[in-house]
């Protein structure tokens, strides 16, 4: 197997990334510095890290490509970052793309044909692959070959193209939308969980160091507490709170500034934002708390169904604001109380 010393990122936009090096800019460099390079640097997801560490070591000891990996869970939990870390730990190149970007089977064939032994192909939003594209993956994943049809009419014939052993890492927010044949070809399946407040605090403190910003411990805790268990949200909030602190002339981000900034951003003490509250109010005021079907809800709030199901519902479900039943979603008493509304049946 050919092993390289560092991860080489290849994406569709070659103007943005060339030879694995992102074009220099302070903001891009800062974003890259937030991304851990090893499993030890990767915060949170302890179970996933422990398992992946074993699988990676075993693959390296056998001098084999790592088995194909499926990472699923809500957005912003570090699936893409973990894919980069896995490739880095393996010491191989990583090529990155997304399901919607692979429009036809030929696009995927070109990607697969350009892989070196042991390389990682990362496909984000893999549930959005077109069916003809997905079918090309079956033989590629299972037996490391693809059949290419050449010619037209009576001259049509299939060419058998062997592929080097490689690892496909697929990421999805909607694992249920993967077809069974594709899902069954992943030897490693990992469910990414929401982060604890303590884990998010560490991420906030690490990110503040990268941003050359100081944040008070109580401010970091409050920011982490309202970040929906999601590192991406925590980092986004930190950037905005940093803006407020700089305008106020604070050298260290205070709790008061953090609370004031999050209030301005309309993020409440449970981490609910304007869209969360609109979803809950729609179910309460328009449908007496539910049950409400996803199509009806999406039409009423002006969001697409996939966004609601992947971005908003997982957090609302896990934190007890809604329940899912056979006829749709229903709000809980906790949702009424959070919105300051009387709970039905209470006197």
Swiss-Prot record:
Gene Ontology cellular component terms for the protein in this record: cytoplasm; Holliday junction resolvase complex
The keyword Cell wall biogenesis/degradation is annotated on this UniProt entry: no
Binding site for ATP: 34-35, 76, 79-81, 142-144, 185, 195, 232
Localisation per UniProt entry: Cytoplasm
Stored Pfam families: AAA_lid_4, RuvB_C, RuvB_N
EC numbers for this chain: 3.6.4.-
Top-tier EC class: hydrolase
Region feature (Large ATPase domain (RuvB-L)): 13-195
Residue positions binding DNA: 329
TM annotation in the entry: none
Region (Small ATPAse domain (RuvB-S)): 196-266
Gene Ontology biological process terms, A to Z: DNA recombination; DNA repair
Region (Head domain (RuvB-H)): 269-347
Amino acids binding Mg(2+): 80
UniProt catalytic activity: ATP + H2O = ADP + phosphate + H(+)
Keyword DNA-binding: yes
UniProt-recorded Gene Ontology molecular function terms: ATP binding; ATP hydrolysis activity; four-way junction DNA binding; four-way junction helicase activity
Entry similarity comment: Belongs to the RuvB family.
Subunit details: Homohexamer. Forms an RuvA(8)-RuvB(12)-Holliday junction (HJ) complex. HJ DNA is sandwiched between 2 RuvA tetramers; dsDNA enters through RuvA and exits via RuvB. An RuvB hexamer assembles on each DNA strand where it exits the tetramer. Each RuvB hexamer is contacted by two RuvA subunits (via domain III) on 2 adjacent RuvB subunits; this complex drives branch migration. In the full resolvosome a probable DNA-RuvA(4)-RuvB(12)-RuvC(2) complex forms which resolves the HJ.
Function: The RuvA-RuvB-RuvC complex processes Holliday junction (HJ) DNA during genetic recombination and DNA repair, while the RuvA-RuvB complex plays an important role in the rescue of blocked DNA replication forks via replication fork reversal (RFR). RuvA specifically binds to HJ cruciform DNA, conferring on it an open structure. The RuvB hexamer acts as an ATP-dependent pump, pulling dsDNA into and through the RuvAB complex. RuvB forms 2 homohexamers on either side of HJ DNA bound by 1 or 2 RuvA tetramers; 4 subunits per hexamer contact DNA at a time.
Free-text domain note: Has 3 domains, the large (RuvB-L) and small ATPase (RuvB-S) domains and the C-terminal head (RuvB-H) domain. The head domain binds DNA, while the ATPase domains jointly bind ATP, ADP or are empty depending on the state of the subunit in the translocation cycle. During a single DNA translocation step the structure of each domain remains the same, but their relative positions change.
Protein name listed in UniProt: Holliday junction branch migration complex subunit RuvB
Organism for this UniProt entry: Lactobacillus helveticus (strain DPC 4571)
């Amino acid at each position: 197997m050919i092993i390289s010393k560092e991860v080489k990122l290849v994406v569709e936009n070659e103007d943005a990334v060339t030879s694995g090096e992102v074009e220099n800019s302070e903001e891009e460099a800062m974003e890259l510095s937030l991304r851990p390079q090893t499993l030890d640097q990767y915060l949170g997801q302890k179970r996933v890290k422990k398992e992946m560490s074993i699988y990676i070591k075993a693959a390296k000891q056998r001098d084999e490509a790592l088995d194909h990996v499926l990472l699923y869970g809500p957005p912003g939990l570090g699936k893409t970052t973990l894919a980069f870390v896995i490739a880095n730990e393996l010491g191989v190149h990583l090529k990155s793309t997304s399901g919607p970007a692979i429009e036809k089977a030929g696009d995927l064939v070109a990607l697969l044909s350009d892989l070196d032994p042991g390389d990682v192909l990362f496909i984000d939003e893999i549930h959005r692959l077109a069916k003809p594209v997905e079918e090309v993956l079956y033989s590629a994943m299972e037996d490391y070959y693809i059949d290419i049809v050449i010619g037209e009419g009576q001259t049509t014939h299939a060419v058998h193209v062997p592929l080097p052993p490689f690892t496909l890492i697929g990421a999805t927010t909607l694992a249920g939308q993967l077809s069974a044949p594709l899902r069954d070809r992943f030897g490693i399946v990992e469910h990414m969980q929401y982060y604890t407040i303590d884990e998010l605090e560490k991420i906030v403190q690490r990110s503040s160091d990268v941003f050359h910003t100081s944040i008070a411990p109580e401010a970091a805790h409050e920011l982490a507490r309202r970040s929906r268990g999601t590192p991406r949200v925590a980092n986004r909030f930190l950037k905005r709170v940093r803006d407020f602190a700089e305008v106020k002339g604070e050298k260290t981000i205070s709790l008061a500034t953090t609370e004031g900034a999050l209030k301005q951003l309309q993020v409440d003490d449970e981490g609910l934002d304007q869209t969360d509250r609109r979803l809950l109010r729609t179910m309460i005021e328009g449908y007496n708390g539910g049950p409400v079907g996803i199509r009806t809800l999406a039409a009423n709030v002006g969001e697409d169904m996939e966004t609601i199901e992947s971005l908003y519902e997982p957090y609302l479900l896990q934190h007890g604001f809604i329940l899912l039943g056979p006829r749709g979603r229903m709000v809980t008493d906790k949702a009424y109380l959070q919105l300051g509304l009387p709970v039905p049946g209470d006197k």
